[in-house]
Amino acid sequence: MQKRVRNRLITIIICFCSAFLGISIILYNLEKNIVFFLPPSKINEIEQGKELRVGGLVKTDSINKIADDKISFVITDNIKDCEILYQGALPALFRKGQGIIAIGQLSNGKFIARQLLAKHDENYRPPQ
């Protein structure tokens, strides 16, 4: 009887450890694929040069074309504004008032984006 209880206990412990390990691996991989972002009012708490995601609405009349593929614009969370500098092709849904997530680094009070993601609502239809 003692051996039977010990074997059952070992089996239960192995099952719990396996389940914990499996859930940990799944959560670790999901964290890499989920797009978390900070609003402009929270980015001052982040150190300069650290890669982060900033999200907000493109402010009206803030889009300035600097060169052929360089653009500057301001995003806001209605508390604070953040100037974004971006070089590259803009997403098709990019426009004033649109929700944007910028991925890049904070440098001298400006956010240098290496990638832009345009947010859309549940009624998304690709541009024609």
UniProtKB/Swiss-Prot annotation:
Gene3D superfamilies named in the record: Nucleic acid-binding proteins
InterPro entries referenced in this protein's UniProt entry, alphabetically: CcmE, CcmE-like_sf, NA-bd_OB-fold
Gene Ontology annotations of biological process type: cytochrome complex assembly
Organism: Rickettsia rickettsii (strain Sheila Smith)
Protein name according to UniProt: Cytochrome c-type biogenesis protein CcmE
Lineage of producing organism: Bacteria, Pseudomonadati, Pseudomonadota, Alphaproteobacteria, Rickettsiales
Any single GO CC term annotated in Swiss-Prot or TrEMBL for this entry: plasma membrane
Localisation per UniProt entry: Cell inner membrane
Purpose: Heme chaperone required for the biogenesis of c-type cytochromes. Transiently binds heme delivered by CcmC and transfers the heme to apo-cytochromes in a process facilitated by CcmF and CcmH.
Top-rank taxon: Bacteria
GO molecular function: heme binding; metal ion binding
Topology relative to the membrane: Single-pass type II membrane protein
UniProt: heme binding residues: 120, 124
Periplasmic topological domain: 30-128
Transmembrane segments: 9-29
Record-linked NCBIfam families: PRK13254.1-1
UniProt keyword Transmembrane helix present: yes
Predominant location category: membrane
Record's keyword terms, sorted: Cell inner membrane, Cell membrane, Cytochrome c-type biogenesis, Heme, Iron, Membrane, Metal-binding, Signal-anchor, Transmembrane, Transmembrane helix
Family statement drawn from the similarity comment of this UniProt entry: Belongs to the CcmE/CycJ family.
Cytoplasmic topological domain residue ranges: 1-8
